[in-house]
Structures are given as C-alpha cells and as structure tokens.
Amino acid sequence: MNESLFTPFITPTVLGLPAAVLVILFPPLLIPTSKHLINNRLIIIQQWLIRLILKQMMTTHNAKGRTWSLMLTSLIIFIASTNLLGLLPYSFTPTTQLSMNLAMAIPLWASTVAMGLRFKAKITLTHLLPQGTPTPLIPMLIIIETVSLFIQPLALAVRLTANITAGHLLMHLIGSSALAMLAINLPLTLITLTILTLLTILETAIALIQAYVFTLLVSLYLHDNS
C-alpha cells in the first residue's frame, strides 16, 4: 500500500487517545534513578547542562527576568527531548505540528508582552515608534511595528515546525530511495545509506539547535520587556 509523503506527520492514536501524550510522558519513566548515589554521572550531566543553559539564557536578565529561569530551562529540555525522540524509528514528533508549537509560542510571547506592559508600559510602547521618525511616517511605522510584534509568536512556531518537518521529509525520501534500490543496485544503495546516516547526525544537531533557538528567542522577548 502506497502512503502519502505526509503520513508520518498524522497524529496517531492509541485506544482513541493521542499517542503524543505517551511520547511526552513515557520516556522519563525509562530514565534510571538511584536512591543511594546522589551525585552519579547522570545527575552530574544534568546539573552541568542546566548550569550551561542558565549561563547562556539568563546572564543579561534583571531580577524580574531571572524568575523565568525554571520556565526557560524546562522549555529547552522539553523541545530538545521531543525532537530527539522523533528521530527514533516508528515514532511521532509533536513539534512537527504547527498547532502544538503555536500553543507553546503564543502564551510565552503574550506573557512577556504583558510583563512589559505591567512593569514598564511607556518603554514597551515606545518600541512601536523608532526614535527620530519623521512625522508623516509615524502612523505607517506604528502599524508596521504592531504587525511585526504580533507576528513574533507565529514566526517562532513556523520556524520550529518547518525545520523539523523538512528534515523528516528529507530522511523519509532518502530512506525510501535506499529501500527501492536495494534489489537494483547494491553499491548505490550503500552510498544512499551513508548519506542517510550523515543526514541523521545532522538532524540530531538540528533538533538540539532548534530547541536552543526557540528558547533563546523567548529569552530575548523577555529581555526586551523586563
């Protein structure tokens, strides 16, 4: 049976429930925990990663911005874990769904804007009008800056969706080509499998980079409004 190219991005269900819930909640249960060794290798690596994330994200923030430390750390770990799990065979990647990415981007963006309007409304509103703007251009620039402000969460979600989806589609195409050529040309199949392996390594890096970019942009929005 021939499948559509976008079949892997259809949300699967198990007993009528979205399988994305299992993908998100089940993997943490597989991580071994030690009741006797507090500072084992896994804990040390986790602490090192958290310190690295906080150093990269929160250095330029003030006291109000640093209250978001736990949120941003959890966000980057969640997106990175979801992207990496989606690279496993016969798995589903929730971040290929624009609806899910919008559900993450819009509340975070709205929270940063609300924070700016609450604590420094004048400075936040002055961002809508660049300093030194000629008087005839003021109405048009206010409209342009307002539209660009409301496009920010859409850009966040579309960027993550497009990058993850494009990589999965390319892997699907190359994998299908390798399978089709298996009985036709073995040397060419080996070359294709080598390309697929390299692409998988690249997609692993992209999965981590996109999680970092998404969280970094949220951090920048927070910095502008805190």
Curated annotation (Swiss-Prot):
Membrane topology: Multi-pass membrane protein
Key words, A-Z: ATP synthesis, CF(0), Hydrogen ion transport, Ion transport, Membrane, Mitochondrion, Mitochondrion inner membrane, Transmembrane, Transmembrane helix, Transport
Catalytic activity: H(+)(in) = H(+)(out)
One GO biological process term: proton transmembrane transport
Subcellular location field: Mitochondrion inner membrane
Name of the protein in its database record: ATP synthase F(0) complex subunit a
Subunit (UniProt): Component of the ATP synthase complex composed at least of ATP5F1A/subunit alpha, ATP5F1B/subunit beta, ATP5MC1/subunit c (homooctomer), MT-ATP6/subunit a, MT-ATP8/subunit 8, ATP5ME/subunit e, ATP5MF/subunit f, ATP5MG/subunit g, ATP5MK/subunit k, ATP5MJ/subunit j, ATP5F1C/subunit gamma, ATP5F1D/subunit delta, ATP5F1E/subunit epsilon, ATP5PF/subunit F6, ATP5PB/subunit b, ATP5PD/subunit d, ATP5PO/subunit OSCP.
Organism: Pongo abelii (Sumatran orangutan)
